[in-house]
């Protein structure tokens, strides 16, 4: 007989198995977060309490790699409510000591040390797998992974060391028991994990999270030794005899440190009525901020040796895991709304029958992308399980009952590109154009130019960024409702556009499409835009998305900057005549600049009067090419003169790569970029200077960036020192511009053959 509840359970079981393989065995990227996974398991347990989904945690590795673990690595029962916490605490005597450890979000493993007299220690390493079978990853120890210091193991098999040096920490029974073991085996459970600092410094631009980084190296046939050196083995449990306890947790931590490993952060608490899920949640949030590693919960253990139970396939009773969980609810989909992004991508929003989660009424959730809607058959009538935790956007945990085929509605005018659907119409809709313009202005910090205001400007005929930047305020103020826009918003917008760097303007225009924002664009060397190696982008991306449209993007950026400066001058002086120091550092062409004849580029020639020969145009335009940073020679050919251009000078800060630590300064970043330098968010091998707010000597603890600079002998400058150097270089450039302006060419025109 068909049982719909049993069918639902089997569907969710397949989803759980897929998630287990991705998370524990590194088969692809994780398909759901830890919270989504826990909610899925809870719901499956409600459907089938006898299914055992809560006791089986992990995934069996492939048969070719699986081995039986030397010691079972059982999971932990989870506590989520105060009622569950109270029931667990009733099992222990009052004033019992509790150990509260960080629950690290890494790759769980088991290290087995075999120690014998007069023999080098033998170390084996295993992944947890499903708790019974795992994978032998001992080979990683030959590629740079460290789980301890070898020289310490000699002391562990030295009976004198145990009796004299460590005797004050161990009881006589433990020492006697250890000495009688013919072959001494130490089992240490721990976590392979990368510190948050190292991940943010070196790997955040290449990997989704630290766990993906470690999992990928563990499952690689040829792991990267440099990455393995950054992976820490953090121990949290030590067993010497699988049948009996041998030491207290204080001694356990001492032994961890003696073998050269830093144990997991642990706090000791007395069991009392004041301990609650609320106090644990507060403590967890504090540890998430302070911990060296990513953590996803707490492990709470009773510190009592008499409770020791031989490791088996059952979850321990004296230890539980505490996590902050979001609530879940079942609801029905009413319809799917498709909205266009600024990049012409359709983004789905799923509307549902309103339900209450954590005291908040939820009526819609994110649909992720087109493939998610299509594959999961989400449409009118679909029954879904949703979740919400804290301020996280509500989303679907699982689809309990899919919609009928005819109710799964996708955009009719769309085309598939990967997992997304893109608009494929002949004309760009109003929705996309407005979002593009809003993104431009908000990216540059222009106040007041949001969706409603920009939409009204669009309806009034201002349908491009250029149209708004170049708007005539006298005409705009005559349109009903646009007085404040013309008098206040536009002038402040011109200031922001005028002072923006070329990279910021390109990013604001979304010039190279979605996925290539300011962080990646900043890595493009404007002096060599055709270079195929750009940090953060593949060679294919540069070849197909950057270089083919570089000149067009550059021309548009030049025009916008020139237009904004002209508007500001017009507002201040009533004239749009460019000033002598108005040349923008990335190749601007003023309206009164005429292109001069050149073999490789267009040089600028300011025309103040007709040429001596009476020609209408003082310069003869020739074939143009926009390689504006090429340093080849140029000449201005007229009927009466030929002006040879000097070679282009190197920008004063070209080759300087700065990183700021403990402060941000957008204006200073723009000034450095204008002088040819770069400012990065994180340190890497290209950084030349690290900038601090204070002058040396520097107080400990050092920031990660400062420590990197000191370890690698980089320049460390104070903010005051950097600002003085930038000011000096800017003053030099101003003097050079004035000098060039006073040096007329033989044809009676002031020729600017050198760009700053």
UniProtKB/Swiss-Prot annotation:
Residues 648-742 form the BRCT domain. This is Putative DNA ligase 052L. InterPro entries: BRCT_dom, BRCT_dom_sf, DNAligase_adenylation, DNAligase_N, NA-bd_OB-fold, NAD_DNA_ligase_OB. One of its GO terms (biological process) is DNA replication. It catalyses: NAD(+) + (deoxyribonucleotide)n-3'-hydroxyl + 5'-phospho-(deoxyribonucleotide)m = (deoxyribonucleotide)n+m + AMP + beta-nicotinamide D-nucleotide. Pfam families: BRCT, DNA_ligase_aden, DNA_ligase_OB. It comes from the Viruses. SUPFAM superfamilies: BRCT domain (SSF52113), DNA ligase/mRNA capping enzyme, catalytic domain (SSF56091), Nucleic acid-binding proteins (SSF50249). The lineage of its organism: Viruses, Varidnaviria, Bamfordvirae, Nucleocytoviricota, Megaviricetes. Residues 610-620 have a biased composition (Low complexity). The keyword Translocase does not apply.
